[in-house]
Each structure stands twice: as structure tokens, then as C-alpha cells.
Amino acid sequence: MKLCGFEVGLDQPLFLIAGPCVIESMQLQLDVAGKLKEITGKLGVNFIFKSSFDKANRTSGTSFRGPGLEEGLKVLDAVKRQIGVPVLTDVHEYTPMNEVAAVVDVLQTPAFLVRQTDFIKNVCAAGKPVNIKKGQFLAPWDMKPVVDKAKSTGNAQIMVCERGASFGYNNLVSDMRSLSVMRDTGCPVVFDATHSVQLPGGQGSSSGGQREFVPVLARAAVAVGISGLFAETHPDPSKALSDGPNAWPLDRMEELLETLMELDAVTKKHGFARFA
């Protein structure tokens, strides 16, 4: 599949979707995007910048949600033009899809909305590549009907994303078998290494996280074989306005990516024979 001018798939090098969880300010987004472009350019990694203009599913109604659609699109457009990288953002049921699609290169659907048929179809009908996040409550094989809905719009540029599965209360686990299972959708598979270490609602009025396990799960996913890695990052996760506990520090992105790209090359060297 071609995405933002480059090929993605299990016969292609790992690509990266990364950026702060939410748009905090114009300058922060430009700084992070610029640093990520520098890192990925050095390592030869295809890169898509990610950030959200509205986090509609925050645990608390008083938590920071973002700058909103109008200001958020201005920021994403500035990142795209000034830094020169493609951009991705997530959309919601109330989002004017065509307005967002006029600015961003890739649309993303939140995990909680994966079963909303009309929503999935509306997003995919906008004509942009779409990254569909698997719900924390959904079996990996249940992504096939979701993809069928998405592709019924005529949009063939669909990716599926694993972001962990609910394991009791306030906890997620990553079943690496799901990465193999979701290949059967015929779509490139992306692994979300940062939301997979989230502890949903684990801090009462906000979600916790165990960012120390980001490299553990990222290495495991790359060893299984994935097309892309999703990772939220921040210069100072302790001060991030959303999902700081599971964000990976920006100053450690290069060392993480360097390891993952080496592992990715080894994993993909001999292909992916199906085991009986």
C-alpha cells in the first residue's frame, strides 16, 4: 500500500507515526515535529506526524481536550508546510470530515468508536488513508468486518492498529498474536506502543501508564512483524497535558528507533511464511 508517498507493508521497512498526544501549542508541535524529522531522516525512517485537536474521551470532564478544530487545523497545516512532513489526526462522530481531510494526510479513528458503522464509513468516504484503531474490547479477528465496512466505501488505503486489550479494571495487555491475526484483514498492521502501556482511568480522574514497558512491547511487536509503529512522545512527559504517563520521552526516541529498525530488518529478512 502506498501511504504519503512511500510504500508500507511487511516487505517494506518499518514506518513511524509519532507526536504529542494533543496539540498543546503551535511552538511545541513545530519543535517536536522538527526533532522527529531530524531523527527519522538520520535513521532513514518514513515518518508521519501525529497530534490531536480534540481529545473527546478524557477521563475527567475538566481535563484539557485540545485547541479545537479551527485552531488545531491551523497548527497541523503549519507543521505540514513549515516542517515538511505528512500529518495525521484523529476524528470523531461530530467532526466535519471533508474539512479535516482538506488539511491532513491521514485520518485516524479512536478505538472506542471502532464498532460505529456509520462513523467508520464516513471517515473512509473522505478519501484519505485511514488508521483504524482496534477497540480495547475487540478480538483481533473481529477487525475483519470493520475493514469490510471501511473498504465498502471504495477506500483501499486502510490500516489497522493494535493498542492493547482490556485486562480486568484499569489495565491493558498486548497479545502479540493479534498482530498476526490482523494481517488476515489484508491491511498493513500498526502497533501503538504507548497507548498499549496505558492504565485507563488508573489515577482516578486521569489515566496512568507504565512507559518503562514501551521498549519491551515495541521490540516484541517488531519481532512479530508489523508495517508501522505508533508512539506518542513529548519533550517532558511529566508536563504533558494528555497521556503523559505513557508518552515516550522525545530525547530517547532516537535510541529506541535505532534498535527497532535493526530488529525490523532482521525480522523481515526471510519473509513471513504461514505456519500450520
UniProtKB/Swiss-Prot annotation:
Membrane-traversing stretches: none
E.C. code: 2.5.1.55
Cellular compartments annotated: Cytoplasm
InterPro entries: Aldolase_TIM (IPR013785), DAHP1/KDSA (IPR006218), KDO8P_synthase (IPR006269)
A single GO molecular function term of this UniProt record: 3-deoxy-8-phosphooctulonate synthase activity
Record carries keyword Transmembrane helix: no
Coiled-coil ranges (or none): none
SUPFAM superfamilies: Aldolase
Gene Ontology CC terms, in alphabetical order: cytoplasm
Annotated GO biological process: keto-3-deoxy-D-manno-octulosonic acid biosynthetic process
UniProt enzyme class: transferase
Pathway in which this enzyme or protein is active: Carbohydrate biosynthesis; 3-deoxy-D-manno-octulosonate biosynthesis; 3-deoxy-D-manno-octulosonate from D-ribulose 5-phosphate: step 2/3; Bacterial outer membrane biogenesis; lipopolysaccharide biosynthesis
Domain of life: Bacteria
Catalytic activity reported: D-arabinose 5-phosphate + phosphoenolpyruvate + H2O = 3-deoxy-alpha-D-manno-2-octulosonate-8-phosphate + phosphate
Keywords (A to Z) from UniProt: Cytoplasm, Lipopolysaccharide biosynthesis, Transferase
Principal location class: cytoplasm
HAMAP family: KDO8P_synth
Family: Belongs to the KdsA family.
Designated name of the protein: 2-dehydro-3-deoxyphosphooctonate aldolase
Organism: Xanthomonas oryzae pv. oryzae (strain PXO99A)
